[in-house]
Amino acid sequence: MVQGPIQVNSEIGKLKTVLLKRPGKELENLVPDHLSGLLFDDIPYLKVAQEEHDKFAQTLRDEGIEVVYLEKLAAESITEPEVRENFINDILTESKKTILGHETEIKEFFSKLSDQELVNKIMAGIRKEEIQLETTHLVEYMDDRYPFYLDPMPNLYFTRDPQASIGRGMTINRMYWRARRRESIFMTYILKHHPRFKDKDVPVWLDRNSPFNIEGGDELVLSKDVLAIGISERTSAQAIEKLARNIFKDANTSFKKIVAIEIPNTRTFMHLDTVLTMIDYDKFTVHAAIFKEENNMNIFTIEQNDGKDDIKITRSSKLRETLAEVLEVEKVDFIPTGNGDVIDGAREQWNDGSNTLCIRPGVVVTYDRNYVSNQLLRDKGIKVIEITGSELVRGRGGPRCMSQPLFREDI
């Protein structure tokens, strides 16, 4: 089989190509009154966030990793007039609540922009002051204090969530919160229209039109045989079952099992990758709270049912034993954030201490601020490459959240 542009058969294989999104003007459109609606707790300082992100990208390049940017790929995907028009229509359709019937005027505003300017503006959002429109609807008088026709997308620098590379394909995700739902439109157009991906037979295991929510932070590729997916506030059991059926029926798939792991519906446990992240053949960084529950969890292993067009589901309760079994290792080592200390662990978990990016077996990228966790990783034989993130972390995501692997070497 000809090698395609997507290949991710593990969490730990040597990373060759990664998708990032450089923080942009969308962060400057965060204001205190509307933080929660855009899923932020704080406002990063854009200049410093960009400097930190640039250093993150350079750190990856220094390790021989190709870095590609979502905003650039998106602009390169809409060069054809018809594609650009459809892209704008999809964005505006998803934004009807805020554009208040002003599609025509907004399209006129967009018509003056280059492809790259258009993508950047859609990501940044449109303030009402940017387009002088006559108030004609009652809802506009009532909603006059809301500052945007097009909401900013400040979460976009977390490229892990709107899509997920699995095997030679991707899921293009229906995001749980409306604030993030438009984000997966970009990858939809990239796969269909970018020269790097179009006509390359990249399977879409789930697309954004699915009625069921799923987010990439809940999707972990444990091996060429096994996926682990969190059942969380943002990822539904229905989406996981649909994904399993779609992957299992693919004639070229190598995946045989999906381990669905229920996690609490709280912001602390936002996604599975805030609870555990694979960093070596038998090692995981974990949220220390998992130790209280690890032998009493709802874990479901989904398998194809002996060649039939159906699945079978086996329930278990012990996380460590389940992971060791599906990874075919004697045991797995859980390395707790902040060494499990009641203070250090809570602080470093808030700062995404367990959200590490593995770039090859036993080598991870982490925030330098999580020094207790980083030293513990080193004590366990893990090579730790530290990056600064005083502003990036304000979005509540770590190096794994900020990256979407497109190609890893097989292990």
From Swiss-Prot:
Nucleotidyltransferase recorded as keyword: no
UniProt key word ATP-binding: no
Family matches, as InterPro entries: Arg_deiminase
Pfam families hit by this protein: ADI
A GO BP annotation: arginine deiminase pathway
Active site: C401
Record keywords, A-Z: Arginine metabolism, Cytoplasm, Hydrolase
Location(s) in or outside the cell: Cytoplasm
Pathway(s) the chain acts in: Amino-acid degradation; L-arginine degradation via ADI pathway; carbamoyl phosphate from L-arginine: step 1/2
Transmembrane regions listed in the UniProt entry: none
Any one annotated GO CC term: cytoplasm
Enzyme class: hydrolase
Database matches in Gene3D superfamilies: Arginine deiminase, L-arginine/glycine Amidinotransferase, Chain A
Annotated EC: 3.5.3.6
Catalysed reaction, written as an equation: L-arginine + H2O = L-citrulline + NH4(+)
GO molecular function term, any single one: arginine deiminase activity
PANTHER family for this protein: ARGININE DEIMINASE
Family classification: Belongs to the arginine deiminase family.
Protein name: Arginine deiminase 1
